[in-house]
Swiss-Prot record:
Keywords: Cell inner membrane, Cell membrane, Ion channel, Ion transport, Membrane, Transmembrane, Transmembrane helix, Transport. InterPro entries: Mechanosensitive_channel_CS (IPR019823), MS_channel (IPR001185), MSC/AndL (IPR037673), MscL_channel (IPR036019). Homopentamer. NCBIfam families: mscL, PRK00567.1-4. GO terms for biological process: monoatomic ion transport. It comes from Xanthomonas campestris pv. campestris (strain ATCC 33913 / DSM 3586 / NCPPB 528 / LMG 568 / P 25). The gene is mscL. One of its GO terms (cellular component) is membrane. The lineage of its organism: Bacteria, Pseudomonadati, Pseudomonadota, Gammaproteobacteria, Lysobacterales. This is Large-conductance mechanosensitive channel. The chain crosses the membrane at residues 16-36, 84-104. The keyword Ion transport applies. One of its GO terms (molecular function) is mechanosensitive monoatomic ion channel activity. Belongs to the MscL family.
Amino acid sequence: MGMVSEFKQFAMRGNVIDLAVGVVIGAAFGKIVTALVEKIIMPPIGWAIGNVDFSRLAWVLKPAGVDATGKEIPAVVIGYGDFINTVVQFVIIAFAIFLVVKLINRLSQRKPDAPKGPSEEVLLLREIRDSLKNDTLKNPTVP
């Protein structure tokens, strides 16, 4: 029973729950970014450089074929277009995270409080100093 209660205590800590929420939101955000890149950003870029569909860009190392027994042999392909899409997705996600962290840092930095006036002791010492100065000016013979 000790291990179960320890696990429950671990799982219910704030950090673990925050992490779980972050993972779920991150997965959903990843899908949004994927759709943004594949459906909104890359098509105009592909159109601008000559109607290129980045998701279909690939180097065919060995074309598909059929062996002697009639069995189909799939092509060997390096799909660099998908890699380009993934890099663009990464840049967008990294920039979004940068903006969020920057916002959090800005919000967490407390503005320094306005400097408080001098303490009562300092005010009293100033008053004594000024009083002594005035006495010295009025009666310069007093040592």
